[in-house]
Regions:
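Short, compact, well-ordered microdomains
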Residues: 95-140
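Short acidic DE-rich linear segments
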Residues: 143-144
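BZIP DNA-binding basic region
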Residues: 1-22
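Basic nucleic-acid-binding interfaces
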Residues: 27-43, 90-106, 117
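Long, low-complexity, charged/polar intrinsically disordered regions in eukaryotic proteins
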Residues: 20-78
Length: 144
């Protein structure tokens, strides 16, 4: 059973996948910052890879008031790095729709290597085949 308000630790993998799908569908139908923030929230804890193939995930902490902060904490090995929501929004506005050769093509923005990996996983950008090999998704989706 899926309850939209249920914490992700308490729902099944299938329900979590549905939650992410619905958030992305909502954003594609109405591409507002608020709806994209919903996508970011649902993908917290999911594994991504950078341009060079290094794995990472992110978490979003809650502030004293119980609301989520607009800061992503990138979990890479032993250290965490913060990534500001404003950086993600800036990069989002720089997507032109074509294959994005490298992270800096989306702008000289702090944390871009992580944003690039996230945008690829979200299906917002395409990357060259040699980069797909590193990022682990070279499969042709139409070949089945």
């Amino acid at each position: 059973v899926y309850y939209p308000g249920t914490e992700k630790e308490k729902i099944s993998v299938g329900a979590e996948r549905q939650r992410r799908y619905r958030a992305m569908k909502r954003w594609r139908a109405d591409p507002t910052e608020e709806n994209f923030w919903g996508v970011i929230l649902t993908y917290a804890g999911v594994k991504f890879k950078t341009y060079s193939g290094l794995p990472f995930s992110y978490e979003i902490k809650k502030g004293r008031n119980g609301e989520y902060t607009k800061e992503l904490w990138i979990d890479r090995r032993e250290k965490s790095k913060s990534l500001a929501w404003s950086s993600i929004v800036l990069a989002l506005k720089n997507i032109k729709g074509e294959v994005v050769d490298r992270p800096k093509a989306l702008g000289d923005i702090r944390g871009m290597t992580y944003i690039y990996g996230m945008f690829y996983r979200f299906g917002l950008i395409d990357v060259p085949d040699k980069v797909k090999e590193k990022m682990g998704r070279l499969k042709d989706r139409n070949s089945k």
